[in-house]
Amino acid sequence: MSFNHKTIEELHDLLVAKEISATELTQKTLEDIKSREEAVGSFITVSEEAALKQAAAIDAKGIDADNLMSGIPLAVKDNISTKGILTTAASKMLYNYEPIFDATSVANAYAKDMIVIGKTNMDEFAMGGSTETSYFKKTKNAWDHTKVPGGSSGGSATAVASGQVRLSLGSDTGGSIRQPAAFNGVVGLKPTYGTVSRYGLIAFGSSLDQIGPFAPTVKENAQLLNVIASSDVKDATSAPVRIADYTSKIGRDIKGMKIALPKEYLGEGIDPEIKETVLAAAKQFEALGATVEEVSLPHSKYGVAVYYIIASSEASSNLQRFDGIRYGFRADDAKNLDEIYVNTRSQGFGDEVKRRIMLGTFSLSSGYYDAYFKKAGQVRTLIIEDFDKVFADYDLILGPTTPTVAFGLDTLNHDPVAMYLADLLTIPVNLAGLPGISIPAGFVDGLPVGLQLIGPKYTEETIYQAAAAFEAVTDYHKQQPIIFGGDK
């Protein structure tokens, strides 16, 4: 018997009633992972021994009836540090790296007696939108194994969508939670910048990165955010603001809520069927009592260019630490210190990572800094101001998560510009540090379509309120791929 169809609350009730034990739930989860892993390739590492040991310890002390997450398995993206469990960032550079500490988000999960079941596949150093740049394997879409799962948190999304786990953690720098959530028909939230500590997250773009949750439903997503969100003295960008319970508004109606629909989000480059799906969702929100009106975010069209200058510049700085000296991969054909650096980085990094390091180094170089990095920062401010103007009059922004449904494996991985453009709807949210969620909103050609809801900073509870209201009157979240036992 598999438990992957049961919600976290249902699993908690079973655990409290001792109808199942944490060990039994962990064993069943491991079976679900193994039976589906060959088809989707969600995991880099499955920490079976450690997970069963932790489950046994939880059983020995007893399930806490007041702790919803006690004994619940959790998958963690492989750029989030886990003490004693390989954390590779899907790179040859860190193929053998075992951290000696836990990321704060993981420590928070352990504090709630969650069980880390394994580390999920991703694009190398979170640089990519298809989970095809991983050094280890290519993850496949849960709905169609010839399609990409999205990225960079592709493994975390497919692990949930395929029924391997109920909950997972990802990271989002330019859409890396929301895009794979959309492609796989699950719920993925990028929290407000600073809501979840970045301590222990292997850095890509430090002003953009944010850890967030994946789940099959809106409420379960909010329940996981309750666990991982916290202020943290170890992260200088950690926000002091902390919502007591992100589920507090779930179930409330949205009558009177004002929702903005940017015309730029339905313009050139958006698949017509995606546009139709979003417009249908807008009508659904209106039927629920919200007002939906067209607005403009005029500088959003510059988001991709701005992002790839800023993110690559920050990456070129952050990735300087990987040099073959302290830990991780080291080239064995070097004859001196310079060759250690050059050969290690040439052999240890994949093509996409090297491309972004070169772009970032160029953007920061003397003579080009003002024309590229400084200018990108100025346009980033204009993008933020666009959002501020809209949120002066509206509660939320509505739009598609992605311009298309999942594309084929090996179709865009040799065309970096086309791959970058796939993030044009998610990137502005990171540039502005805002919260954004992707929820299932329909299907095109049998593949899931994601609907994105964006709010002002620290309004995750309002986003969850609107998302849950939409979820309650639709059944897209209930439809499952064949690998999960569905009929799609």
UniProtKB/Swiss-Prot annotation:
Pfam families: Amidase (PF01425). The keyword Transmembrane does not apply. It comes from the Bacteria. One of its GO terms (biological process) is translation. Keywords: ATP-binding, Ligase, Nucleotide-binding, Protein biosynthesis. Its EC number is 6.3.5.7. GO terms for molecular function: ATP binding; glutaminyl-tRNA synthase (glutamine-hydrolyzing) activity. InterPro entries: Amidase, Amidase_CS, Amidase_dom, AS_sf, GatA. GO terms for cellular component: glutamyl-tRNA(Gln) amidotransferase complex. It catalyses: L-glutamyl-tRNA(Gln) + L-glutamine + ATP + H2O = L-glutaminyl-tRNA(Gln) + L-glutamate + ADP + phosphate + H(+). The active site is at K77, S152, S176. NCBIfam families: gatA. Belongs to the amidase family. GatA subfamily. HAMAP family: GatA (MF_00120). Allows the formation of correctly charged Gln-tRNA(Gln) through the transamidation of misacylated Glu-tRNA(Gln) in organisms which lack glutaminyl-tRNA synthetase. The reaction takes place in the presence of glutamine and ATP through an activated gamma-phospho-Glu-tRNA(Gln). Heterotrimer of A, B and C subunits. PANTHER family: GLUTAMYL-TRNA(GLN) AMIDOTRANSFERASE SUBUNIT A, TRANSAMIDASE. This is Glutamyl-tRNA(Gln) amidotransferase subunit A. It comes from Streptococcus pyogenes serotype M4 (strain MGAS10750). The gene is gatA.
